A protein has these predicted regions:
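Acidic, glycine-rich flexible loop segments
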Residues: 91-150
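N-terminal secretory signal peptides
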Residues: 28-98, 130
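Secreted/processed peptides and extracellular or luminal domains of membrane proteins
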Residues: 19, 65-68, 146
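C-terminal segment of classical bacterial N-terminal signal peptides
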Residues: 16-26
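Bacterial N-terminal signal peptides that target proteins for export
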Residues: 1-12
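General secretory precursor processing signal
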Residues: 16, 62, 143-144
Length: 150
């Protein structure tokens, strides 16, 4: 379910910007840029310290042609999982307060496919019931909105 409400997109951008800024301020610049799925998968299996730089304006809203919001930054993840279909999945979550002063848990998940497609999903969850209250999805490509560094 993709909400196209302007205030939701703004709130998503604010929260993503906070996560991305926090992650990027706590790390040094990585040595290598990942040019494709195969080198990313190898880095994951080799236990490399991988960082994702994200530019949602170079991605599209899931299932459509509209560009994503003007949000850029970097994120580190603690764990990666290569699934049976070779999709690489990873996620992070954090507690935050939206611009309307509503407390939420935000869940960010990523799936990288062998063809280089990257699915980005953000979901706001109620901290009381853990039910999803809002979510958005974006379609990116390795090197086009989503770049991996190690």
């Amino acid at each position: 379910m993709l909400h196209r409400n302007g205030s939701f997109i703004f709130a998503t951008c604010v929260v993503l910007t906070g996560v991305i800024r926090h992650a990027s301020m706590s790390t040094a610049v990585a040595e290598d840029v990942n040019p494709n799925y195969a080198s990313f998968a190898k880095a994951v299996l080799d236990g490399r310290n991988v960082r994702l730089t994200l530019d949602l304006a170079r991605c599209t809203a899931h299932g459509g042609e509209a560009r994503g919001p003007q949000v850029r930054g970097s994120i580190r993840f603690d764990a990666y999982m290569i699934q049976g279909d070779q999709t690489i999945a990873f996620a992070t979550t954090h507690f935050t307060v939206r611009t309307d002063n509503t407390a939420v848990d935000e869940f960010l998940s990523f799936r990288v496919h062998p063809n280089g497609k990257v699915d980005v999903r953000t979901a706001f969850l109620s901290p009381i019931t853990f039910s999803v209250t809002q979510e958005s999805e974006f379609d990116c490509d390795i090197g086009q909105g989503a770049t991996f560094h190690w």
